Amino acid sequence: HMGLGQPDFKTPKHVVEAAKKALDDGHHGYVMSNGIPECRQAVTRWIKKRYDVEVDFERILIMPGGKPTMSYAIQCFGEPGAEIIHPTPAFPIYESMINYTGSTSVPYDLTEDKDLKFNADKILSLITDKTRLLILINPNNPTGSFVEKPEIDKLAEGLKKHPHVTILSDEIYSRQI
């Protein structure tokens, strides 16, 4: 199945109840543009628990979903003359936003003979002086494939030679491995 990641389960009851309570408590107006402080603080606690990294909640930005997040990030780095490396097949917003910015789309193919996984050497070979952004997604959407740590480490080591490249790591399904 190579479709979009449409949830096939109900929203958890505690999430539904929290949304109802927020509405009942009168929270139906605009919030701070970077997100509700308590929510941002909760994200810092989650990051600490998951990655053992301290992050100031002032550096956290709450977004209304994956699509606008990807769109804004690609717009930040994309411009005519820039190259953006991205997987294919992948979430359609990547290539459409790259084209919107006037950047050059540089796909790295995820093929069945490689179990739909990226190859670090192939990605590194695509980097030029014009590369501004490298989009990674693991596990991949829509293939469901995921890349093992040794290959990720190999890519990370190779990227040290390219400090001009920013990594956009789409981790929407990372907790499902």
Label every model-predicted segment.
Residues 106, 112-177:
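Active-site phosphate-binding strand-loop segment of PLP-dependent enzymes
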Residues 6-7, 67, 91, 138-142:
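Short glycine-rich anion-binding loops that position phosphate/pyrophosphate groups of nucleotides
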Residues 1-65, 72:
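N-terminal small-domain helix-loop-helix segment of the aminotransferase-like
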Residues 54-60, 80-83, 130:
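Short acidic capping loops at alpha-helix termini that bridge into adjacent secondary structure
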Residues 76-98:
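Conserved PLP-anchoring active-site segment centered on the Schiff-base-forming lysine
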Residues 100-105:
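A short helix-loop-beta submotif of the ANL/AMP-binding
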Residues 65-71, 88-89, 150, 177:
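Short N-terminal helix/helix-N-cap motif within the alpha/beta-hydrolase-1
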